[in-house]
């Protein structure tokens, strides 16, 4: 039987979710303690928002955002430059048979939330939302 899929692709296994969360917490701690031997990276405050692992746990995509939202490119470059040391530090704390390859990308969640908030604040959208609320619940029975 085929595994059910949602609109965002195949659902993540419990192991993928657990390993992703372990990597996220450990990376957050490593970055907060400034354990990396790179003054440029240690000078940045970087939030690790989420870690998504591939189904075979060989690749971990790390979604990050520098505090304040500025210096995104510099943060990604610093993380990529120190990827080997970050993997080594992760390996010391995590007891995994294979440590995934780390890929760093900027977390777009906050930008998407801002765009949605701006869209909902527009007068034409607000008018449509208020009209839908005045019409009452839409239950599909035509009444």
From Swiss-Prot:
The keyword Cytoplasm applies. GO terms for cellular component: cytosol. Disulfide bonds: none annotated. Keywords: Cytoplasm, Ribosome biogenesis. GO terms for biological process: maturation of SSU-rRNA. Gene3D superfamilies: 3.30.300.20. PANTHER family: RIBOSOME-BINDING FACTOR A, CHLOROPLASTIC-RELATED. NCBIfam families: PRK00521.2-5, rbfA. HAMAP family: RbfA. This is Ribosome-binding factor A. It comes from Jannaschia sp. (strain CCS1).
């Amino acid at each position: 039987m085929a595994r059910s899929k949602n609109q965002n692709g195949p659902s993540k296994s419990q192991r993928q979710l657990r390993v992703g969360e372990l990597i996220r917490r450990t990376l957050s701690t490593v970055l907060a303690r400034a354990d990396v031997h790179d003054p440029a990276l240690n000078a940045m405050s970087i939030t690790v928002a989420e870690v998504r692992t591939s189904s075979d746990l060989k690749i971990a995509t790390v979604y990050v955002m520098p505090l304040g939202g500025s210096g995104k490119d510099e943060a990604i470059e610093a993380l990529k430059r120190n990827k080997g040391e970050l993997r080594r530090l992760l390996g010391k704390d995590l007891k995994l048979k294979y440590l995934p390859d780390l890929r760093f990308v900027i977390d777009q969640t906050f930008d998407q939330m801002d765009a949605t908030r701006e869209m909902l604040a527009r007068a034409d959208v607000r008018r449509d939302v208020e009209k839908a609320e005045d019409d009452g619940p839409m239950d599909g029975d035509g009444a």
